Amino acid sequence: MPSFGTLLSLSTLALLIAVVYQNPEPLIRPITGSIAFKIIQQLFEHTHCYVTVKTNSVDLPYAECFSVANGKFKRVFLDETSYDVVKDLRKGHVLPGLWDGHGHLMQLGELMDSVNLFGAGSMDEVQKRLVQYKALRQEAGTSEQWLRGVGWDQANFEGKWPVAKDLEINDKFKDLYVMLDRVDVHCIWVSDKVLSLLPNPTPEVPGGEIPADGVLCDNAIDLVMKYYPKPSNERRTKFIREAMFELNKLGIVGIHDAGVYPAELVLYQELSKNESWTVRVNAMVECEARNTFCPDDVANISTPDGRLHVQSVKLFADGALGSWGSAMIEPYSDKSSSGSLLVDAETLTKLTHKWAKAGYQVNIHAIGDLANRLAIDAFEEALKVLCPDSTLRECQSKYRFRIEHAQIIHPDDQRRMHELGIIPSIQPTHATSDMSYAESRLGKQRIAEEAYRMRSLLRLNPVFGSDFPVEPANIFEGIYAAVTRRSPRTGLDAGGGTNGWYPSETVTLEDALDGFTINPAYAAFLEGKAGVIEAGAYADWIVLDEPIETLDMEALRKLTVKETWVGGEMVYRRTGPVPLPWIKN
């Protein structure tokens, strides 16, 4: 057995080598260039080789091998002969790890523990799913743990809003606390038991609407949330871990978490220290009171390993299109309403400036064209004050203001976005999910000129996401929707054809991949660290059975990931038979 002195000497040598290896300054480069050092260096590296490696790097777009140490890529090269020892030879085709540019981590985990109402085509189907869920969850519906669900759509109820009485399915349901989120999570549908908690008469809420007894939308939701029993940290931890596993399964290594409360950030910071934290999170702060300034409740966070990043805030300009809540310049085509703003223009501008001055990137939820106009106004005014001695475009490159959804934008405001360089955060599957009703709601002209822009905004390097759990957290479905403008569920457009819905707004496969890799990295101040396979970047990658660029587009609808790696560690491996994707001839 080696003596204590020998072990101490070896430990000291190893530490010295590690320091030299991590700090190759000019004075010690002769050491790092020696054959002996290269041999020792391999002890700290692990090398992986695949059939192809798509890197997203300008210097070397495609490679075959890379080495990893301390959670980062160290070298990327074409073949194993350019390196002395190959430590891991694998089959498969590699892409940089995928990022979802707009999702909701906690809500995804909570949905996985709730009633899934997506696709429920009738009131009977909703009630059937609630009864089935309750039979398995006796604790659901108590005052301590409400029965939760998400995914209903009044369009499936013959266009009529549901009411609280619809939730009294049988005698067992009459005394239950039930809260169900609409498909866009901008409205809730609650039981009479929940309504009994509210003041009588129910007060009017600026920026909120109560379209039916038991349905509350946008700011009116806050009336109920005062009484909602928040899940314990134990349950929240369960939500997060289950959601992260689901995301890893889909090849997702990082997300922009679009609205995290201060109390949740405390839990995030604690959990991010553990190995079970397998998704990088760029979190947007959302104050407990929406559209306020709460810097004392949060702090900028950037963990050394890059697992948690907090440097942005989320504000809300309007609601959602599906519930007529998005704020429009002109009234809807199918309703004598223009939607509603959740905040006035002056407050939005002041909040933007205050948050930016406090060191936070500002991301504004805006769907309607009026909301998008006010968001652009707020950004422009803030930039003028923040950088009086530089151009607005230069200032924007520093602060990187974003519009979340950027769904309906007047042509004049599209030009302003390009002039300022405002980053659009787009969800391609929103276009294909909304196409069945969007034209009747907005009219053909607004759809053709303003709505669901993708190709029109490419010069702004748009961030792509899914808005999970509103849409499935499947990036390949998002890529399919962006490239084809067809539903990833059916493969068809709004008319039942295959031409695509307003196909002039399609993007290329390469553009779509950028939207889920390098563009989210830039929008999170992580360029060179995420969305790319090159020296110094986080060692995050996914493995597919075939190169994605060789696949027929229809294969994307069923594509699955073979492996997902985060920080050089495998966090997901597919089991079972390998699916056979359709390959181009």
Where are these regions (language model features)?
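His/Asp/Glu-enriched, well-ordered alpha-helical/loop segment
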Residues: 238, 353-363, 370-401, 405-406, ...
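Short glycine-rich, flexible loops that bind phosphorylated cofactors or substrates
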Residues: 156, 197, 432-433, 551
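Beta-rich accessory regions
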Residues: 567-569, 575-577
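Short loop/helix-cap segments at secondary-structure boundaries that form the rim of catalytic
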Residues: 77-83, 301, 415-417
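Acidic (Asp/Glu)-rich catalytic clusters
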Residues: 271-275, 298-308, 417-421
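Divalent metal-binding segments
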Residues: 2-296, 311, 315-371, 395, ...
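Short, solvent-exposed loop/beta-turn-alpha elements that line the ligand-binding surface or hinge
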Residues: 553, 574
